[in-house]
Swiss-Prot record:
Main function: Possesses 5'->3' exoribonuclease activity. Required for the processing of nuclear mRNA and rRNA precursors. May promote the termination of transcription by RNA polymerase II. Essential for vegetative cell growth and chromosome segregation.
Ranges of Basic and acidic residues composition bias in the record: 519-534, 948-984
Residue stretches in coiled coil: 121-147, 468-541
Biological process, per Gene Ontology: cleavage in ITS2 between 5.8S rRNA and LSU-rRNA of tricistronic rRNA transcript (SSU-rRNA, 5.8S rRNA, LSU-rRNA); mRNA splicing, via spliceosome; NAD-cap decapping; negative regulation of transcription elongation by RNA polymerase II; nuclear mRNA surveillance; nuclear polyadenylation-dependent rRNA catabolic process; positive regulation of termination of RNA polymerase II transcription; sno(s)RNA processing
Protein name in UniProt: 5'-3' exoribonuclease 2
Region (Disordered): 402-424, 519-549, 939-1018
Gene: RAT1
């Protein structure tokens, strides 16, 4: 999920990062659509590697939002095949396809999965109730409904979790479909397909990241490989940047193009005709897609992140890593975002402004290869804490202005004269309910006054979405109004109706009297409270005026001291132990703790912790300090997860809320360490994240643990739980306040049941390796078949292969599922009408990644050839000098611009490439030679007026020789004077430079040498 609204914000701020996908139309012959020629040239430009985050395909295919879902699981799998085939025809990878399905996630992610799945089960229950009500209404109208339709339940989307029968069926189906394409599609003959199903631990996108890091570690890796990843998650953008593979792009649906489409509810999908279903299928097949070009985003960021007057060389790669890290505070899948940060409010720009103002005072960047410099992080967060109060006030003012603007628009709309399409104009402050001719409230309506609607606005919204607790609240208010209405009606006489000079109807007259009566009751209640308050004794009643003055002065002084020296008050009563927190006795319903916190008013700090954690004021320091420690551990874990892989499978953030920014102080000396641990088994994760309502996805032996009152872990599966809206408007944005899982108790109870599992159930509860499938036309086919499957092969033999021959590296071994040559592979889908396949047409093997020789380095590899720049000098200047509209409303979704025929070309744009060196990492040796010139360049900024920022000059020198990232100021393209052979024309000069090189690339750095320090060789 990542950062909400991040893609929308990013594409508006940097409009040239996106371009439309060009799809080749299918040819019709006698009404039959011919398949697209996969082997033909790609109108979007050629691509080497494609990575599919399959959960982003499986979810919309199995439970679509805007149309009836597939009838059976087989139909769902066929829909997955159809969608995947369309994506592949758009991207057309030529070398490698990685299909990654979410496996068991780290514990840090399970908390979010648990919240989603509990809410998903509740939403499914509401949808089933709505479906049953619709069926009852139809039967009351005399319609005959088949039992199969009437008893149909909403398919449980929680089945898309590792370990369920559906995920097992999906894995088998994906392996068959891949083999079918390799055996029958000529365009796939050289494609190598890696399938990492749900039995392989790890999230899909992070298994893809592990694969890319492994390929980069191979000595023969081509640094000019083009990559593309498909998916809708915002964190794919961060992952693309974190690879430091500039030839990278993201393929995704154009969700903005679908914003205006009608949203069908349950009733719409039930009543949908076959013609309407066909129309929706046609619309879905024409949904537009977008490219998001990481290379163009890097160009924008080179201008956005460029900072003068640095005491150290500007390093674009590390600056990008800092930018990615700052985005984590605005939202991620593992930690709650900081209360003062929201992407919609340009919070990333706020953090960037702080970073650029502080960077010259820092000794180095905040991040380095996935590790944090806590001193630098503390300085940035401390400055954010100083601005926090102003951010809350600004947000409140903007909300008020937005609300007032909406009210004005609403009022203007209601006062319009009807043109035949508008409803009858009504007064702004009148919202009458439905009444019959006798003045009684019509059946099915809520009797609410205007003040009730304002007071219970949030409950009304949630009630309309089916929330039971909100419905109860609204019904109670309505019942009170009904009682008052009956009381008023009994008191009215015929003269009251006759004296009606304004010709009100009976319903209108009763409504007005109800409003008046409620105002009287509220006034009486207010007077009673004032009277009680006046009878209470004063705090300081004394006849002596001087004593009174002294007491008032003492109170004022004490109040000032409380406000100015909060850390010194009641030091003896402050509790240093971390307090136990609770939900304040709230076990269900929808709440909004932000209403009581009032972040925009003074004193919000203490109110925040008291209202959300239900603790005493003297417990706040201990709690906030522990939360800060856990949160810093969390962002350290997330950064390592993105750049090095999972640092710990068992760590998680133990709170539902984030600390306030002003509490991030004195954490620079934290000693952050993680224990790797091991991932849960699939059934253990299912027991951690599924509610009892989804227990049918588990083997039967586990279900009593989730539903029986005698279960030792029954408290992990509440049927009712509170949801804190936390100041948000939409119900899905609320926080489900579920209890955190006790790992020891859960694993003990779960593992005690393993002995009762069947063999098939045990098979689904294992950890496996990915599989590699190739066609019999692949360059490695004969070698792999001979060593692994033909007569005389060694048992348990592992074959290591490298990148040079097939553009893929790894370790293969015999398939554990019993693949054999000269056999048949049947289709696992009954209704698919797909044939049996001969196993001589393809090869299936177990696949393992090459082990990394060392920690991954956040650098561009040797031999990289830059792409042609996409941005003009005007684009760069608009970023650097902040003119125009600060990056927004410029060229929004302007696909009229020429995007180099929609293709971002991959070098050579100039005549040079990176200089290779032993070790495979460039480490900015070239810029190391220019340290002296860099310092002179900084002195120009300090002593004279700053020179014009020239794109990737990186505040080095302005001499003529320019390398990568140093465009010609006059021509606006990349030029460079340093030469290197690296990976060009098949030479092995990649990751390890001279260690296994051929030809002149083996020179490494010896032909040039270098001067000055490198951060990896000191």
């Amino acid at each position: 999920m990542g950062v909400p609204s991040f893609f929308r914000w990013l594409s508006r701020k940097y409009p040239k990062i996106i371009s439309p996908v060009l799809e080749e139309p299918q040819q019709l012959v006698d009404g039959v659509a011919l398949p697209i020629d996969y082997a033909g040239p790609n109108p979007n430009g050629e691509l080497d590697n494609l990575y599919l985050d399959m959960n982003g395909i499986v979810h919309p295919c199995s439970h679509p939002e805007n149309k009836p879902p597939p009838e059976t699981e087989d139909d769902m799998l066929l829909a997955v095949f159809e969608y995947t085939n369309r994506v592949l025809n758009m991207a057309r990878p030529r070398k490698v396809l990685v299909i990654a399905v979410d496996g068991v996630a780290p514990r840090a992610k399970m908390n979010q999965q648990r919240s989603r799945r509990f809410r998903s089960a509740r939403d499914a229950e509401i949808e089933n109730e709505a479906r049953e009500e619709i069926m009852r209404q139809k039967e009351q109208l005399g319609q005959i409904i088949d039992d199969s339709v009437k008893n149909k339940k909403t398919w449980d989307s929680n089945a898309i979790t590792p370990g369920t029968p559906f995920m097992d069926k999906l894995a088998i189906a994906l392996r068959y479909w891949t083999a079918f394409k390799l055996a029958t599609d000529p365009g796939w003959k050289n494609l190598q397909v890696i399938i990492s199903d749900a039995t392989v631990p790890g999230e899909g996108e992070h298994k893809i990241m592990n694969f890319i890091r492994s390929q980069r570690a191979d000595p023969e890796y081509n640094p000019n490989t083009t990559h593309c990843i498909y998916g809708l998650d915002a964190d794919l953008i961060f992952l693309g940047l974190a690879t430091h593979e500039p030839h990278f792009k993201i393929l995704r649906e154009d969700v903005f193009a679908q914003d205006n489409r009608k949203r069908n509810n349950v009733k719409d999908t039930i009543d949908m005709t076959d013609e309407e279903k066909d129309l929706i299928r046609k619309q879905d097949s024409e949904k537009p897609f977008l490219w998001l070009h990481i290379s163009v985003l890097r160009e924008y960021l080179s201008a956005e992140l460029w900072t003068p007057k640095l005491p150290f060389p500007f390093d674009l790669e590390r600056a990008i890593d800092d930018w990615v890290f700052m985005c984590f505070f605005c939202g991620n899948d593992f930690l709650p975002h900081l209360p003062c940060l929201d992407v919609r409010e340009n919070s990333i720009d706020i953090l960037l402004d702080i970073w650029k103002s502080i960077l010259p005072r820092l000794k180095t960047y905040m991040t380095c290869d996935g590790k944090l410099n806590l001193e630098s992080v503390e300085m940035v967060l401390k400055e954010l804490g100083n601005r926090e109060g102003d951010i809350f006030k600004t947000r409140h003012i903007q909300e008020i202005r937005k609300k007032e603007a909406n009210e004005r628009r609403k009022q203007q709309k209601q006062q319009n004269v009807s043109t035949g399409q508008d409803r009858h104009p009504t007064k702004f402050n009148e919202q009458l309910q439905m009444y019959d001719t006798n003045g009684s409230l019509a059946k099915g309506s809520w009797n609410l006054t205007t003040s009730d609607m304002v007071r219970y606005k949030k409950e009304l919204m949630l009630a309309n979405e089916g929330d039971e607790n909100s419905i109860k609240i609204i019904e109670e208010v309505s019942e009170r109004n009904n009682s008052l209405m009956k009381e008023i009606q009994s008191e009215m006489t015929p003269e009251d109706y006759k004296g009606n000079n304004n010709n009100f109807t009976a319903a209108e007259l009763l409504k007005k009297k109800l409003n008046a009566r409620k105002r009287e009751l509220e006034k009486e209640k207010e007077n009673e409270e004032q009277e009680r308050a006046s009878k209470q004794p004063k705090i300081s009643e004394t006849p002596d005026e001087s004593d009174l003055t002294e007491e008032i002065e003492a109170d004022v002084i004490a109040e000032v001291e409380d406000e100015t020296t909060p850390d010194e008050k009641d030091t003896d009563s402050i509790i240093t132990e971390v307090p136990e927190i609770s939900n304040g006795g709230i076990t269900s319903g929808v709440i909004d703790t932000d209403e009581a916190v009032k972040l925009f008013e003074p004193g919000y700090h203490d109110r925040y912790y008291i209202e959300k954690f239900h603790i005493e004021p003297n417990q706040i320091p201990a709690l906030s300090k522990h939360m800060v420690k856990c949160y810093i551990e969390g962002v350290s874990w997330v950064l390592m997860y993105y750049y090095q892989g999972c640092a710990s499978w068992t760590w998680y953030y133990p709170y539902h809320y984030a600390p306030l920014a002003e509490d991030f102080v004195d954490f620079h000396d934290l000693d952050i360490k993680f224990e790797l641990g091991e991932p849960f088994l699939p059934y253990e994760q299912l027991m951690s994240v599924l509610p009892a309502a989804s227990g049918h996805n588990l083997p039967e032996v586990f279900r009593p643990l989730m539903s029986s009152e005698d279960s030792e872990i029954i408290d992990f599966y509440p049927t009712e739980f509170p949801i804190d809206m936390n100041g948000k408007k939409m119900s899905w944005q609320g926080i489900a306040l579920l209890p955190f899982i006790d790992e020891t108790r859960l694993l003990t109870a779960t593992r005690n049941q393993y002995k009762f599992l069947s063999e098939d159930e045990k098979r689904r509860n294992t950890r496996n390796d990915p599989v590699l499938l190739i066609s019999n036309k692949n360059v490695n086919y004969e070698k792999f078949a001979k060593r692994l499957y033909k007569k005389g092969h060694e048992d348990n033999f592992q074959l290591v292969f490298h990148h040079f021959k097939s553009s893929l590296a790894g370790i293969v071994s015999t398939d554990t599922e019993g693949f054999k040559l000269h056999a048949k592979l049947p289709c696992p889908i009954q209704s698919g009408a797909l044939p049996e396949l001969s196993t001589n047409l393809f090869l299936k093997m177990q696949y393992k990644l090459l082990p990394l020789p060392s920690a991954n380095k956040s650098l561009i590899l040797n031999g990289f050839i830059p792409s042609e720049p996409m941005l003009t000098q005007h684009d760069f200047d608009s970023i650097v000098y902040k003119y125009g509209t600060r990056g927004f409303q410029r060229n929004q979704r302007n696909f009229g611009m020429e995007m180099k025929q929609n293709i971002v070309p991959v070098g050579p744009s100039g005549t040079t490439q990176y200089k290779p060196r032993i070790g495979g990492y460039r480490s900015f040796f070239y810029f190391g030679q220019l340290n002296q010139q860099m310092h002179q360049h900084n002195q120009v900024y300090q002593q004279n007026q700053a020179p014009t920022h020239d794109r990737y000059r990186n505040d080095r020198s302005d001499r003529g020789g320019r390398g990568y990232g140093r465009p010609d100021h006059d021509r606006g393209d990349y030029r460079g004077d340093y030469r290197g052979d690296g990976y060009r024309g098949g030479h092995r000069g990649g990751y390890r430079g001279g260690s296994r090189s051929r030809g002149p690339s083996s020179r490494g750095i010896s032909s040039r040498g270098y001067s000055g320090p490198s951060r990896y060789n000191r």
